[in-house]
Regions:
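Acidic donor-binding segment of Leloir-type glycosyltransferases
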Residues: 24-68
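Glycine-rich, basic loop-to-helix element that forms the pyrophosphate-binding segment
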Residues: 66-86
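Conserved nucleotide-sugar donor-binding catalytic segment
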Residues: 145-224
């Protein structure tokens, strides 16, 4: 039997960021997961050496960089490769430059069941959406009314957990692509219920650790 969760990280950064990433997932309170790190292009020697020290739940691989789609969908190829080789019932997508609370996976999986996906909060402006794609109309997510979620336009990469079977049927695309388009297609096609859980679990760019943010919840903002 495979793991409950497959965590997929499209990686392109160096040892410092990846060391933090490995440590954050080593400390997760939820243990039934695999962590697939897909390096975009040939990894440096120091990254290869670091990955040799990773825990047995970590699978490291690299793919040929997709230069033809770098401008419009730089993360599509590594994410889809991760989906293809994953074994988990659920998928979580994590960036390699963020920090993750030890309760991150436990919080995401806590309310997942048949037709439901979980959403958690991030620590900065990347956890907001743009109404109709317009950056002048900003609404913070994912603290948004549960019944309004399918109409939102932006969700940050590590905010959500989805069924693997959904991502296989509706993978990332080679077109102007972002997390909000991927998750919006999932919502439109499979019409899952959304459970917003656990408050803030993701520290974007390490702002909390740098003392620039606190682990607090944003006040709710809703789309008009």
């Amino acid at each position: 039997m495979g793991p409950t969760i497959s965590v997929i990280t499209p990686a392109s950064r160096g040892v410092r960021e990846l060391s933090n990433l490995l440590n954050d997932f080593k400390n997760q309170t939820f243990k039934n997961f695999e962590h697939i790190i897909v390096y975009d292009g040939p990894p440096p020697v120091d990254v290869i050496n670091l990955m040799k020290t990773a825990g047995p739940w970590t699978q490291f691989c690299n793919i040929e960089k997709d230069y033809g789609n770098m401008d419009i969908s730089p993360g599509t190829k590594p994410r889809n490769h991760g989906i293809k080789i994953s074994r988990g019932q659920y998928l979580v997508f994590c960036d390699d430059d963020d920090r993750y609370k030890d309760t991150y996976l436990e919080t995401l999986i806590s309310n997942c069941r048949d037709n439901m996906i979980g959403i958690v909060q991030m620590s900065c402006q990347q956890s907001r959406m743009y109404k109709d794609g317009d950056p002048e109309t900003i609404v913070l997510v994912p603290e948004i009314d549960i019944h309004m979620f399918p109409i939102i336009c932006h969700v940050g990469t590590p905010c959500y957990i989805v069924k693997r079977e959904w991502a296989i049927e509706e993978p990332w695309r080679h077109e102007p692509e972002h997390d909000f388009r991927f998750i919006k297609r999932i919502c439109e096609k499979f019409k899952p219920m959304i459970q917003i859980v656990g408050g803030m679990q993701v520290d974007v760019d390490g702002l909390v650790l740098k003392g620039m943010k606190d682990w607090v919840s944003f006040p709710p903002f809703y789309r008009e």
